[in-house]
Design a protein with these regions (language model features):
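Non-globular, low-confidence helical/coil segments that flank catalytic cores
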Residues: 1-233
């Protein structure tokens, strides 16, 4: 199984000729706008969203297109499990029934957090997907799950923003590998130096798209390998 992270052109996805899993961790332009092109050009069976997005204009456009293309819309919340195939399933950890109020509209605070389990030959590899969650959501996850958050690989929240990746959350996840999806020379200052330091403090190996380009993770029965478009010098 291969998982390709971050922004990819539709043409590239088609060229790879392999199955993909698409979900909108939150319906904001930097997370979901590309879904329209995906749905228009690729045969998509299901799209996974969370209920907090229902008031978004972009969400409404995506839903309209899904109905036109007969794409099944799965709205998820904490406690659900989604089986992809005999090897892979996702456990939805967030959001819960009650939406978190972060004073900023709640988009980040209520983004989908999902833990992926890939089991091949009795060996399970786990990846934590975090959307743009920030401190308030991380605190809730730590309170509910504690050490059950542990994962082999972490998709770092909010592009490495200083408002995310708190020490308590990272301690519970304790990832061997961290993936940061971030644009080169971005104006936000992502990833934050404090976030990088906290990851280094727990001996996590960091992969960044601004430094390495496209990141591909391949999980097989023997090992988990990571390839990048730009090689480390």
């Amino acid at each position: 199984m291969s998982i390709l992270f971050w922004a990819l052109k539709v043409e590239y996805i088609i060229q790879q000729n392999m199955p993909y899993i698409f979900w909108a961790s939150m319906v904001e332009t930097d997370h979901a706008q590309g879904l329209e092109a995906v749905i228009q050009n690729i045969k998509v069976k299901n799209i996974i969203v969370c209920k907090q997005a229902s008031d978004s204009a972009l969400y409404k456009e995506i839903i309209k297109l899904c109905k036109k293309k007969k794409v099944n819309i799965i709205t998820v919340k904490r406690g659900q499990n989604i089986k992809i195939d005999k090897y892979v399933h996702f456990e939805i950890l967030h959001p819960g029934d009650i939406m978190l109020d972060d004073g900023k509209g709640g988009l980040n605070a209520n983004a989908i957090v999902a833990k992926m389990y890939c089991t091949i030959k009795n060996k399970t590899t786990t990846i934590m997907f975090t959307g743009d969650i920030e401190e308030k959501a991380e605190e809730e996850l730590v309170k509910i799950y504690g050490d059950k958050l542990k994962a082999d690989i972490l998709k770092v929240a909010h592009h490495g923003s200083k408002t995310s990746s708190t020490a308590g959350f990272l301690k519970c996840v304790s990832p061997k590998i961290a993936l940061i999806g971030v644009g080169k020379d971005n104006t936000f200052g992502h990833p934050n130096s404090g976030v990088l330091s906290r990851l280094e403090d727990i001996n996590t190996k960091i992969y960044r798209t601004d430094k390495l380009g496209e990141i591909t993770i391949t999980i097989s029965k023997n090992k988990t390998s990571i390839n990048t478009k730009i090689k480390n010098k």
